[in-house]
Amino acid sequence: MDELVHRVLAMFADLNDETLDLHTLFEAGGNEPASRERVIDVVSQLVADGLLEERGSDFYALTTKGRVLAGIQ
């Protein structure tokens, strides 16, 4: 699994939250603008793969499949 994908998924467990907004998920990319832009691509791919669900207003939640992959039961 790509390191950035892992960090994005791990943020849900680390922050113990069911939903996170895109600005919080940007932290997975660090401080560099290019890395933060890549977070947008990763989040879009995770939605397309059924691991994240869009909740509106830039909020995202792990799906059941995403929870399993992230190691959250």
Question: Which residue stretches match the model-derived regions?
Answer:
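Short loop/turn and capping residues at structural boundaries
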Residues: 23, 40, 56-58
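A short, conserved structural fragment
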Residues: 47-57
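Short amphipathic alpha-helical interface segments
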Residues: 1-31
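Minor-groove-contacting beta-hairpin "wing" of winged helix-turn-helix DNA-binding domains
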Residues: 58-64
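Short, amphipathic alpha-helical interaction segments positioned at domain boundaries
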Residues: 67-73
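Short amphipathic alpha-helical interaction segments
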Residues: 32-48
